[in-house]
Amino acid sequence: MPVIKVRENESFDVALRRFKRSCEKAGLLAEVRAREFYEKPTTIRKREKASLAKRHAKRNARENARNTRLY
C-alpha cells in the first residue's frame, strides 16, 4: 500500500493528489478491480489470448497502412 508523508505547510488537496498518483503508479485500483470477482483460470487465459490477438491485428493493420501506396 502506498504511503506518503504530509509535508509541512502542505494542503490536504495536494497530499491527497500525491497519494492518488502513488496508488495509480502502484496499480492498486486495477488490482482491486481484477480481484473483485473470482475469474476462472481458463477465462483469464482466454481474455489474455484475445488481447494478444487484438494487439497483433492492430500492429498488422498499422504495418499494412504504412506499406500502402498513396498514389
From Swiss-Prot:
Listed PROSITE patterns: RIBOSOMAL_S21
Domain of life the protein comes from: Bacteria
One MF annotation (Gene Ontology) recorded for this entry: structural constituent of ribosome
UniProt keyword terms in alphabetical order: Ribonucleoprotein, Ribosomal protein
InterPro entries, per database record: Ribosomal_bS21, Ribosomal_bS21_CS, Ribosomal_bS21_sf
Protein family: Belongs to the bacterial ribosomal protein bS21 family.
HAMAP family xref list: Ribosomal_bS21
Name of the protein: Small ribosomal subunit protein bS21
Organism from which the protein derives: Actinobacillus pleuropneumoniae serotype 5b (strain L20)
Gene: rpsU
